[in-house]
């Protein structure tokens, strides 16, 4: 046992050096807490940053977009607009459907938003149409968020109506009950119903009208309370055969008598079991199917939700007939898991590379083991804190830990290198550990808190980008803090027990060769540094030129928002001429599906035609293209999209818009392309004037591609122009006309069949097979006040007009959305600037407002705050360094290293062809924290040499640079190798990680080369400035 004199120091490390058992057990506790925390952490693609979003859907079959807007959407919007915490309200009113999406502030709990929405719907109930089949239905889901899982249900033996009924009652309800599921939608529209197709000629010949038939059916099928009898000894409940359950029963229904003979419904109509809406259809690949899309609630854990669904599926499918097949077509968690696995592999690779570089420099196994223990201990211990903060294992937190690998080893290296230096001088290991740890303690604290200071501004970033990177910043900060603790406790304790003069002097051939190599490098550096110190102004001009170059590169580098990921799923919109019918669109969709399924990268395809909560019009179709796993296809998603669009261009009469699904979804509506730009006006007429003009100009811009608009005002309308005087004379009201038209052509839901498991509708319509098109209007008959039958054509003229296929609102005002993509040779920043320049040339009137939406709006917000974010990081670090050094000047010397990092990062991004996006910006901010450590280590030792050894500033900084060259080089290479796996990543999610790695590797290389020479020069210049300032003050005091 080594006996130390009472004067031996050690600073905060002394207690831990002297108590190895307690220190070891403390570290074991940290390790166990981290392991337990890791097992408890959920897995997700990104941190949960969803806006609280609620979608309200109201279906009113047969209603035109104009009727849906005025009668359904507008009353609801007026009530929703009064809710507190509402960030944005958008709506889409199309034929028979109103979809309102409510996006709330990030700080508002989703449950509170749900209560407000329910209260608003209740308040608007009396303002909605009295014949609305169902009240508005809300769901806690973002419609723009792609489904976490898509399932297709098919059968070769059963009709789709039966399949849909079983899926709805046996499968969908159970999945909806799983925690985290926000909405389960069934696409395909094959819900069972009894369809009554009236023969217009038959009822006209009998002097009947469709209203007569409707009244007879609704009166014959009821399900209401009948009471009970309560006698002296027993009670009897009353029941009756008041319901009709099958199509056969409806055929036998007597609707009227003529000459004493009954007229049954089957005499004047075709009554059959069919689908509630015959203008809806879905396909899985080429087979008609019921497609089940499962969307998560905002904030729900996607992995655990998907796992729960998969665990329940076998049990659910067992309840279905054997002829029914359930297929999982897509599962987003597959790619999420693959991405997280790849990131974890890169983390392990970074740890291995860092340990390797430590051994290369220390050339000693015991000395390598010490940081080899410190690195995983610091990283694993971080998991325990992540659990308490409700974080998850996701790409960003794992990226933070990967980058932290290079950071956390720095502290251990600095401590080991300093203690080893004293052991090599002949001191006992315990004494060397106490002396070296005590001497280096302030440096460790400076490195730690100045690095954490850089991360502080990230915590104050607003909106969704700030939420996104909060987990990243805190995870990295926690790892750095734990590393500092380990370096001041475990590392010096292990050095005192594991290092010795013999172990450090023991050399093999590799050790001797590498030692000579390092000696030659240090000698060459010393000669170069001496020359540089003799030309300070030239060196200063180089430093200033890097600052100017970094500003120029910042201005001219292409800028983006968030890397476009390859998640293996493509969302598509198929657009046909505005007058296309359901049958025509279904045929076009099948043609396109045939082309898409021939592509070698495509694994499966689901498609949907019809109007519902996601598809606004009959002339459009929704597609979801599921690609093969990344390792089973040759091309990334962007190349696949380009190939598919080229192939589909050969299909006449359709336009295909494709975009890859992303883990980060900011939009609130399903769009055709990745980016959106809106025009908002006080009237539809203003939009009809200016949208075509702007579209024409935008489509000519090379910075944009796939430019399209949701403005469709050429939908065919048969306008029934009623002569009100003639109608009034015959006792026919406008309500009679609307009812007659609705009965004939609205797929009107006139009655409900109640069963124990579900409810089914009775649908009334005219059989138009023999009278297609506008000729069907000639068959409409109305009843006059004297009981006669009057043809509609006798009181009305039919005019063919055009009208919008859908009417969109943003915050209650008409709006149109222009969607666009960005070509490969341009950036989002280029596109945004081109749109803004084009808008200025149009001189839009004051009642037209424009705004970017979704990720484009977030890009503008992030770009505007980026400069201030970097300034805040620099200021925060200056304040921390100024406090630690009790100096106004030394922090400036340290911060002078920053421009070199910026130049290196921006040059690397340019060379790699990467955009300056939010991921790359985070890398630059981290570089601010990394590169200043070189200056800190130099200045700490220079100040100590001046103070304790009486050296001149020049000699002190020169010796400090030579003395700290090896740990500086070692820590820089460790940080570089920690970022290298991210830069070289090629697996799933590599697009997200690569910009961070590229920027950091480039910044570290350039800064390492330059700061070794510029920092000493700037240190001496500021020293001279301080002396000159002191002399001036002294002179003024003497004169005073």
Curated annotation (Swiss-Prot):
Its function, per the record, reads: The MdtABC tripartite complex confers resistance against novobiocin and deoxycholate. MdtABC requires TolC for its function.
Q: Which UniProt keywords apply?
A: Cell inner membrane, Cell membrane, Membrane, Transmembrane, Transmembrane helix, Transport
Tell me a GO biological process for this protein. xenobiotic transport
Q: Which Gene3D superfamilies match?
A: Multidrug efflux transporter AcrB pore domain (3.30.70.1440), Multidrug efflux transporter AcrB pore domain like (3.30.70.1320), Multidrug efflux transporter AcrB TolC docking domain, DN and DC subdomains (3.30.2090.10), Multidrug efflux transporter AcrB transmembrane domain (1.20.1640.10)
Show the SUPFAM superfamilies listed in the entry: Multidrug efflux transporter AcrB pore domain, PN1, PN2, PC1 and PC2 subdomains, Multidrug efflux transporter AcrB TolC docking domain, DN and DC subdomains, Multidrug efflux transporter AcrB transmembrane domain
Q: Which GO terms describe its molecular function?
A: bile acid transmembrane transporter activity; xenobiotic transmembrane transporter activity
What residues form the membrane-spanning segments? 15-37, 345-362, 367-389, 396-418, 438-460, 472-494, 535-557, 867-889, 909-931, 968-990, 1000-1022
Origin organism is Escherichia coli (strain K12)
What is the induction note for this entry? The mdtABC operon is transcriptionally activated by BaeR.
Q: Report what the protein is called.
A: Multidrug resistance protein MdtB
Return the GO cellular component terms, semicolon-separated.
efflux pump complex; periplasmic side of plasma membrane; plasma membrane
Bilayer topology term? Multi-pass membrane protein
């Amino acid at each position: 046992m080594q006996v130390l004199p009472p004067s031996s120091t050690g600073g905060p490390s002394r207690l831990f050096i002297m108590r190895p058992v307690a220190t070891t057990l403390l570290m074991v506790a940290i390790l166990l807490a981290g392991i337990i925390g890791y097992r408890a952490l959920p897995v997700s693609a990104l941190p949960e940053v969803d806006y609280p979003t609620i979608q309200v859907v109201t279906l009113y079959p047969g209603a035109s977009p104009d009727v849906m807007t005025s009668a359904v959407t507008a009353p609801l919007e007026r009530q929703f607009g009064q809710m507190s915490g509402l960030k944005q309200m958008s709506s889409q009113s199309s034929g028979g459907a109103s979809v309102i999406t409510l996006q709330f502030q990030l700080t508002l709990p989703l449950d509170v938003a749900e209560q407000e929405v329910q209260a608003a719907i209740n308040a608007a109930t009396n303002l909605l149409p009295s014949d609305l089949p169902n009240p508005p239905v809300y769901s806690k889901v973002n419609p723009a968020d792609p489904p976490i899982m898509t399932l297709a249900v098919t059968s070769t033996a059963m009709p789709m109506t039966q399949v849909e009924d079983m899926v709805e009652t046996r499968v969908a309800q159970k999945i909806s009950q799983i925690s985290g599921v926000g909405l389960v939608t069934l696409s395909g529209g094959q819900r069972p119903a009894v369809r009554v197709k009236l023969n217009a000629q038959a009822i006209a010949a009998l002097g009947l009208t469709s209203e007569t038939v409707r009244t007879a059916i609704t009166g014959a099928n009821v399900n209401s309370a009948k009471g009970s009898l309560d006698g002296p000894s027993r009670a009897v409940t009353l029941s009756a055969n008041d319901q009709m359950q099958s199509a056969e029963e409806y055929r036998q229904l007597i609707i009227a008598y003529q000459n004493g003979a009954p007229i049954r419904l089957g005499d004047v109509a075709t009554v059959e079991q069919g689908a509630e809406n015959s203008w809806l259809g879905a396909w899985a690949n080429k087979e008609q199917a019921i497609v089940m899309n499962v969307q998560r609630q905002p904030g729900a854990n996607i992995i655990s939700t998907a796992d729960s669904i998969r665990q329940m599926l076998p049990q659910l499918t067992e309840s279905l007939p054997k002829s029914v097949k359930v297929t999982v077509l897509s599962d987003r968690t597959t790619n999420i898991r693959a991405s997280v696995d790849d990131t974890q592999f890169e983390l392990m690779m970074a740890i291995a590379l860092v340990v390797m570089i430590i051994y290369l420099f220390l050339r000693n196994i015991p000395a390598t083991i010490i940081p080899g223990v410190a690195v995983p201990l610091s990283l694993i211990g971080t998991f325990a804190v992540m659990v308490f903060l409700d974080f998850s294992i996701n790409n960003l937190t794992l990226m933070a830990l990967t980058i932290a690998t290079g950071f956390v080893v720095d502290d251990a290296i600095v401590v080991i290198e300093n203690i080893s230096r004293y052991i090599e001088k002949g001191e006992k290991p315990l004494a060397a550990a106490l002396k070296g740890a005590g001497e280096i303690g302030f440096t460790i604290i400076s490195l730690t808190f100045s690095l954490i200071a850089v991360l502080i501004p990230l915590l104050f970033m607003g909106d969704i980008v700030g939420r996104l990177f909060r987990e990243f910043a805190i995870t990295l900060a926690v790892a750095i803090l734990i590393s500092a603790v380990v370096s001041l406790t475990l590392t010096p304790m292990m050095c005192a027990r594991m290092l010795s003069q013999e172990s450090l002097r023991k050399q093999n051939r590799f050790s001797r060769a590498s030692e000579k190599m390092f000696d030659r490098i240090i000698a060459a550096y010393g000669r170069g540094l001496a020359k540089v110190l003799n030309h300070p102004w030239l060196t200063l001009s180089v430093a200033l030129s890097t600052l100017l170059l970094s500003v120029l590169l910042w201005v001219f580098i292409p800028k983006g928002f968030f890397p476009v990921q390859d998640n293996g799923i493509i969302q598509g919109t198929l657009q046909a001429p505005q007058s296309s019918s359901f049958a025509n669109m279904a045929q076009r969709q099948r043609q396109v599906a045939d082309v898409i399924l021939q592509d070698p990268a495509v694994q499966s395809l689901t498609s949907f035609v019809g109007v519902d909560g996601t598809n606004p019009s009959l002339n459009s179709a929704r597609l979801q293209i599921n690609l093969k796993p990344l390792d089973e296809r040759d091309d990334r998603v962007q190349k696949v999209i380009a190939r598919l669009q080229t192939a589909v261009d050969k299909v006449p009469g359709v336009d295909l818009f494709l975009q890859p699904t992303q883990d980060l979804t900011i939009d609130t509506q399903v769009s055709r392309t990745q980016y959106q730009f809106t025009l908002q006006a006080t009237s539809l007429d203003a939009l009809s004037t200016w949208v075509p003009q702007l579209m024409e100009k935008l489509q000519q811009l090379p910075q944009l591609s796939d430019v399209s608009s949701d403005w469709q005002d050429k939908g065919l309308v048969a306008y029934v122009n009623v002569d009100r005087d003639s109608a009034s004379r015959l006792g026919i009201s406008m309500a009679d006309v609307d009812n007659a038209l609705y009965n004939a052509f609205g797929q009107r839901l006139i009655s409900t069949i109640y069963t124990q498991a579900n409810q089914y509708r009775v649908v009334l319509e005219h059989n138009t097979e023999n009278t297609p098109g506008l000729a069907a209007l000639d068959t409409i008959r109305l009843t006059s006040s004297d009981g006669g039958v009057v043809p509609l054509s006798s009181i009305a003229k039919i005019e063919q007009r055009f009208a919008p296929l859908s009417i969109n609102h943003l915050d209650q005002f008409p709006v149109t959305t222009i969607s666009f993509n960005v070509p490969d040779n341009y950036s989002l920043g280029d596109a945004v600037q081109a749109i803004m320049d084009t808008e200025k040339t149009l001189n839009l009137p004051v009642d037209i407002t424009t705004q970017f939406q979704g990720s484009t709006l977030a890009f503008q917000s992030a770009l505007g705050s980026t400069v201030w974010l970097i300034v805040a990081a620099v200021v925060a670090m200056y304040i921390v360094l100024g406090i630690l050094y009790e100096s106004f000047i030394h922090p400036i010397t340290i911060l002078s290293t920053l421009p070199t990092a910026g130049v290196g990062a921006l040059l690397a991004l340019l060379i790699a062809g990467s955009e300056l996006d939010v991921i790359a910006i985070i890398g630059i901010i981290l570089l601010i924290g990394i590169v200043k450590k070189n200056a800190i280590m130099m200045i700490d030792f220079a100040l100590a040499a001046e103070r304790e050894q009486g050296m001149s500033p020049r000699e002190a900084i020169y010796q400090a640079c030579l003395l700290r060259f090896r740990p500086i080089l070692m820590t820089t290479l460790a940080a570089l190798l920690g970022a290298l796996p991210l830069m070289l990543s090629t697996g799933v999610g590599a697009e997200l990680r690569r910009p961070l790695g590229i920027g950091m590797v480039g910044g570290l290389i350039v800064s390492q080369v330059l700061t070794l020479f510029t920092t000493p020069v700037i240190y001496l210049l500021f020293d001279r400035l301080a002396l000159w300032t002191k002399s001036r003050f002294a002179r003024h005091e003497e004169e005073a």
